[in-house]
Amino acid sequence: MANIKSAIKRAELNVKQNEKNSAQKSAMRTAIKAFEANPSEELFRAASSAIDKAETKGLIHKNKASRDKARLSTKLAK
């Protein structure tokens, strides 16, 4: 455990951020799975939005976001 006050604060913040990031990533995955289970335009927009939000917050790389959205759009087109 950290002894210095600033290190203690950073450790607490890291725990909070980890929970927040995990929740955001989980929401993205849930939106993608919902679309894959029942491909529709509405679910595609929701999944695409969730992917964009995760990319903006730095949870996933921009290339992964682009790749994921491209794969979803091909599933929608079929």
Swiss-Prot record:
From what superkingdom does this record's organism come? Bacteria
InterPro entries reported for this sequence: Ribosomal_bS20, Ribosomal_bS20_sf
Tell me yes or no: is Magnesium among this UniProt entry's keywords.
no
Tell me the Gene3D superfamilies matching this sequence: Ribosomal protein S20 (1.20.58.110)
Q: Which GO terms describe its molecular function?
A: small ribosomal subunit rRNA binding; structural constituent of ribosome
Q: Name one GO biological process term.
A: translation
One matching Pfam family is: Ribosomal_S20p
Q: Is RNA-binding included in the keywords of this UniProt record?
A: yes
Q: Keywords in alphabetical order, please.
A: Ribonucleoprotein, Ribosomal protein, RNA-binding, rRNA-binding
| A cellular-component GO term for this protein | small ribosomal subunit
Instruction: Please describe what this protein does.
Output: Binds directly to 16S ribosomal RNA.
Q: Which family does it belong to?
A: Belongs to the bacterial ribosomal protein bS20 family.
User: Which protein are we looking at?
Assistant: Small ribosomal subunit protein bS20
What is the native source organism of this protein?
Streptococcus pneumoniae serotype 19F (strain G54)
The gene it comes from is: rpsT
